[in-house]
Regions:
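Catalytic strand-loop segment that frames the active site of acyl-thioester-processing enzymes
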Residues: 1-35, 116-117, 128-173
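Hydrophobic, proline/glycine-rich low-complexity stretches
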Residues: 1-86
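Residue-identity detector for glutamine
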Residues: 47, 88-90, 165
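HotDog/MaoC-like acyl-thioester-processing domains
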Residues: 69-157
Length: 173
């Protein structure tokens, strides 16, 4: 339960969020399911399919290269047990885009997370930008269909980030 509570504090749980921080009736935040993704970024996945062998994935994913998470989607299928359990996960690179020499590369991945019984817990989809990795001759990044409207936002939210929150997050591993 300690890891689940520490994670909740690290992402901003406060005094009104006892269901995520107090062990008596503890629940795991759904975003706790993103942890398998962060455990595999910059790590060579064991399964490269469905990429063709011609892709130079070894040149893109290197532990010395910094990266930027461009987007992340998590689909939850069941709650995460906050007390005990083991994740089994499969990380698949679904696409690699070459932005050109000096412009980086973009890698799209899917991670299926299962519990010990093999039941799906969640699926993570992400897009990661590796700024030092472009120019390998891969397919170009498709243009975005997103249109940003020229108007005021629907709503705005001011939030507080504790001065120690970054330390708590790093302590989660």
């Amino acid at each position: 339960w300690r890891d689940v509570a520490l994670y909740a504090l690290a992402v901003g749980a406060g005094r009104n969020d006892l269901m995520y921080t107090y062990e008596k009736y503890l629940k795991a935040l759904p975003t706790y399911g993103t942890i398998p993704y962060w455990g595999t970024v910059n790590v060579r996945p064991y399964q490269w399919m469905p990429l063709p062998a011609s892709m130079l994935a070894d040149e893109i994913i290197k532990p010395t290269i910094s990266f930027l998470n461009m987007d992340h989607e998590i689909i939850m299928y069941r709650p995460i047990d906050p007390i005990k359990g083991t994740f089994q996960y499969q990380d698949v690179i679904t696409d690699v885009y070459d932005r050109g020499e000096g412009k980086g590369a973009v890698v799209k991945t899917r991670i299926d997370v299962r519990d010990e019984a093999g039941n799906m817990v969640c699926t993570n989809y992400s897009t990661t930008f590796f700024h030092e990795a472009g120019g390998f001759g891969g397919k170009p990044m498709p243009k975005s269909d997103v249109v940003i409207p020229d108007r005021e936002p629907d709503f705005e939210l001011d939030d507080y980030i504790s001065p120690v929150q970054n330390l708590l997050y790093r302590l989660t591993g």
